[in-house]
Regions:
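Flexible beta->alpha loop and helix N-cap segments adjacent to enzyme active/binding sites
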Residues: 1-219
Length: 219
């Protein structure tokens, strides 16, 4: 997922560790290579149905679970999540949360088993690196760019069980297996890392809910 200088640096470090320093080689599964941050304790079980219902009712949720992502995209562990059916959510994220230009698009995260019903593309996109035309833009306008495209991410239960279960619950409620997914940070900030970062973000940014390793904060 780190297609650039950052990925080259990680590759060089792994090569040095294995080939020069004789460290054992670790075989990463494909879904593991994008979550290379520090591991944090899961404080409690997540009430996926409750969080999904809040999103369906219009809440913007700061979502922190597991290791943080490596690479240029938020891939479901350090994300701001919202309902893609409501155009107002894109405006609110741009104007109030991110404080950036009104026209900036947001990416969707979609269940892999359903992505071809919603996006005109032939292969999964687990690292949010591909852009495709949206097949049903009238149903998910908040993630559809002005040219009808969207840079989407697909997710499986094996790849990210927490975000997968949340989207499953959202689909049960709405019939839509898609969420807005954008990086968990405010204007001029890096993506959040620690639980303390998440609590501070919730206290200072007008999101409706934060889910921090199972702990729920809400207004």
């Amino acid at each position: 997922p780190g297609c650039g200088d950052s990925g080259i640096g990680i590759g060089a470090a792994l090569f040095t560790a294995h080939c020069i320093c004789d460290q054992p080689r670790h075989e990463y599964k494909p879904h593991e290579i994008c979550y290379l941050g520090k591991e944090y304790k899961q404080e409690r079980e997540i009430d996926y149905e409750y969080v999904a219902r809040r999103i369906a009712d219009g809440a913007i949720v700061a979502w922190m679970n597991g290791r943080s992502e490596f690479g240029p995209r938020a891939l479901g562990n350090r994300s701001l999540l919202a309902d893609p059916r409501d155009q107002h959510n894109r405006d609110r994220l741009n104007h109030v949360i991110k404080q950036r230009e009104w026209y900036r698009p947001f990416a969707p995260i979609v269940l892999e088993e359903s992505y071809q019903e919603w996006f005109d593309f032939d292969v999964p996109s687990p690292f949010m690196l591909y852009t495709a035309q949206v097949k049903r833009p009238q149903e998910i306008p908040a993630i559809t760019h002005v040219d009808g495209s969207s840079r989407f991410q697909t997710v499986t239960e094996e790849g990210n069980i927490h975000i997968y279960k949340l989207i499953k619950e959202f689909e049960k409620i709405t019939g839509v297996p898609v969420l807005i997914n954008t990086s968990l940070n405010g204007k001029g900030q890096p993506i959040l890392e620690t639980p303390e970062d998440g609590r501070e973000f919730f206290n200072n940014v007008p999101v409706d809910m934060a889910v921090i390793h199972g702990e729920i904060l809400e207004r």
